Amino acid sequence: MRELDAINLTLEALGESRVMDINTSNPSAGLARSALARNRRGLLSTGFWFNVVEREVTPTADGFIKVPWNQLAVYDAGSDSKYGVRDGNLYDLMEQNQYFDSPVKLKIVLDLDFEDLPEHAAMWVANYTTAQVYLNDLGGDSNYANYAQEAERYKSMVLREHLRNQRFSTSKTRFARRIRRARFMV
């Protein structure tokens, strides 16, 4: 789904005309676009299979690690350290400094453009935004409920796909190993 299509979905719900360009002077389109961006960042900040990457980064000669990614969050993937970003550099929150002498393994939650989202995630954001803008402008009625229900349907599809991509397995648990080792008596 394109960002323009998501904006037009919101405009049609409000009973307004579609726009042909994303950079229009229509105030409702601007409202829809800002709500779409806010909800997109809210969705992505959770971290899903499509916007979480793990990287090992090496500090430069002066000890800094530049953070070139358009990230929403940075987590440690190798130890119990806590990291943040300060002035474009990785910052160790535990040690309170930004100087590193060894490579660091990071888990990075990326901020993706709307067009780069998987279809179900884009539809989730578009319908959630439509429901939210509709509720703020026209109040809650059956149309609002329909958009909210559609958003929940796409949300469940995204969560199902996320779970599938995580490859969780109960066969790797301690309880499953106990069952495999057990001797069954007949």
From Swiss-Prot:
Its EC number(s): 3.2.1.28
Keyword terms: Degradation of host capsule during virus entry, Degradation of host cell envelope components during virus entry, Glycosidase, Host-virus interaction, Hydrolase, Viral attachment to host adhesion receptor, Viral attachment to host cell, Virion, Virus entry into host cell
Highest taxon above the source species: Viruses
Homology family: Belongs to the tail tubular protein gp11 family.
InterPro entries membership: Tail_Gp11
Protein's UniProt name: Tail tubular protein A
A Pfam family annotated for this UniProt entry: Tube
GO molecular function, one term: hydrolase activity, acting on glycosyl bonds
